[in-house]
Amino acid sequence: MKKARKIILSVIVSVLVLAFGAAAVLTYLIIPSVTFDFSSQSELTGRASGFLYGFAEDDIPSREIAESIGINSLATKTAGGLQHPIGDVRDVSDTFLSAGGEMLMVYTQDMYDTWYYQLDSLPEYNEKVRKTVTEMESSSYRDSLVYCIYNEMDNGAWLGNFWEAENRYKFYDAWKETYFLVKSINPDAKLAGPGHCGYNYDFIKEFLSYCKENDCLPQVVVWHELSDQSIYRMEHNFDGYYSMCDELGIERIPVCISEYGLMSTNGIPGESVKWISRLEKQDAYGCVAYWRLANNLSDTVADDVTPNSNYWVYNFYGKMKGKELASTERDILHSNIGKYLKGVDPLMNKGFIALASYDKDEEKFYVLAGGSEKDSKIKIENLGDAFTDGDKLSVKISYVDYKGLGGAVNSPTVAEIKYITVLGGSISFTLPCQRESQAFFVEIEKGEADSYKNEIKTVRYEAEYQSLDGIGATVEGGAYALSGGLCVKSISSETAPFVFKVNEKSGGIYRLDLVYGNVNSEGSERIAAYLKITTGTNECIVKCPSSIKPDCMECVSLEVKIQEDKEIKVEVLTEGCLITLDFIDLTPVSEEKVYVDRLTSRNTKEENAYFAVIPSDGYYKLSGITDDSLVTINGNEIEGNGDGIFWFGRGYNKIVLPEGVSFSGAERADYKVSSIDVYTPSETAVTGAAQISEDENTSSGEKFGWISSDKESGLSLLYKAPHSGYYAFTIEYANSEQGGYHDYNVDLVERYISIFVDGEKQGNFFFRSTYSWDYYKTKTVMLYLAAGEHSIEFTNDGSYSFNNKVTYAPDIGSITIIPVN
């Protein structure tokens, strides 16, 4: 058989060479491509937009940014669970569901505080299940629940080596008992299983056979895809699953891959395209694995309101409408051609992969693609009667590239707008791929468009390709996402400056994106690092927040002048910090506009919705708004004043306009009002054990700290509202609390502030970790105030607590109160 395959392949190659020539065959074999069949269409589900522990607390990340990616599923901690100090279903369900989420899966074994779960006994575990399920079944989110009652039992930690049949049947018996326990509480409850850490045909088939015989079939089948072979093998795995269902005579139960993706590649846009495409092709639910933090949609946002590069892949996916098109991939150099020729596996690819859909109502194609380091081809064939040869179609090609897990990417880049012609019932075009880390989004519709080609090029310089002579640093791989898979570690204030040799053809002003890691020396507290960036005679000092782990990449951006020597030196100034360098990107500086777009996520219900990614807190003018119509900003109805100027907090903002009103852009407004008030710690009244101290890292030079639930401490102030309406409370804060230890997850604690206006509680507002106490960010909360003077209190009332622990507010540098309009 192996010999036959080789003979067949050699015959095919020989025929191709004779028919088309060696150059054409070489092109066919080397150029990656995906061909879509317009005549073969199926439902587009959006189910791959799911996350394991994607939310830490209420609105962390924000419901608006989650809605924009069409979030579909969430796997998280059961009510009252102790596995992590965050992610309790009681606290995150409202954010998830209000963002449009569908499947809310809870891991009931996350009642335990250890990993892997420290078993007391199965009867005691079932009692924990009884307690948590009973509570959740009386909740407002019960109709969305799916109970994953056992997670990764095939690791053998509870019941012994799974390769021994006796131990597997111990698990099946335990499953049956817990299954009927949950069903006794709610006969209509949905349960998920077996929950294995990987796909094993024999194990899953045996489990389903047992469940059929014992009337305890799950309502959702769960396994994990966490292998570097998963992209290759996922279609094969699903084919095996479908065949076992047919053989057993049971329906094809919906599948949720409740943990997908690799620690080393999650967060890279081009890799995310692959997982999304594989899952969408199977109509499967999927949740991105939780390898690091629980407060960033599994490395899909930079913080609670800021997109990173990976965010845009899920934003693109959330925009896709209509029917999915069947596809055929070809990327021989990233395939398993060796195993195929040996007869081990069918021919499979994990390089250039794409997903496409067609919206009949809009007569529009959407293509999501990535994973190639060279120009790659997209073809859509068998267009039939929908298009006629000679029809002109406009093609808009946008892309994003990896900028670190924590690097802000406020917009995708438009690479090209062009038109193509239908020929022979098909269309084709080339994507200008440069790196496998890139992801492309293509929108194709009838009609010609003004041509555009982006001439502003970004050039990347990998740290591992630079000279390390005399520096004392090392080139290493990393556990987490890296550009090119390598980085330079252990650069410190005691090593020589690190030098990037750049070869820009001309000098000038460039935006420099420095992608780095920053950790403290062993045993010391996390701190931000100051780096000196030198280009010729120009120096710039930049503050780099902690990245918590050495190979978890953050990004800082600055403008630099490239001079004749074409060197960029990076020197660490802060003692006690170890810096990792991944790469720098250099882009010629151009005018940067606030990114604004229509909000067309599949989860968005409003007809006239937009979003804007705001670079910094302030007043912005929305073009086209000329009356006092109500404008809804992040769920708050704001009365306009005719000038279209509103206060926005930094990051992602959802804007809903009245019917018939639209705007095409936003720009910073030089707008001053007499009622803006900035309160520093020394200008407020202190209560309880709260303390004011100096802090050079805040805008005021001081901070307000130690606001705790057990000391009735806080700060209060008086504010006179000039008119009734919404006011922005922009709070400058730092938070670096951590609760517990985990082998790879970082158990950050999101502190909260309880705000009271005239004695009436407005809510608990959570503040995402800033990773160190010396790095401050801002969060904007919008509250309605009647005209007149108000007493406003900022405290932590202890109404929410993990495991009955004392709770704290973040450190506060200043509070700004200002009318939104």
Language model features with spans:
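Extracytoplasmic
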Residues: A449-N821
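Catalytic-core region of carbohydrate-active enzymes that cleave or remodel glycosidic bonds
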Residues: L226-K321
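Non-catalytic accessory regions flanking glycosidase/transglycosidase catalytic cores in CAZymes
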Residues: K2-M105, D110-V146, D173-G193, E251, ...
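Structured loop/turn residues at beta-strand edges in well-structured enzyme cores
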Residues: T45-G46, I69, R142, C216, ...
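Conserved beta-strand positions
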Residues: Y53, T76, I149-Y150, G193-P194, ...
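Flexible loop residues that form catalytic
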Residues: A56, A79, E152, L226, ...
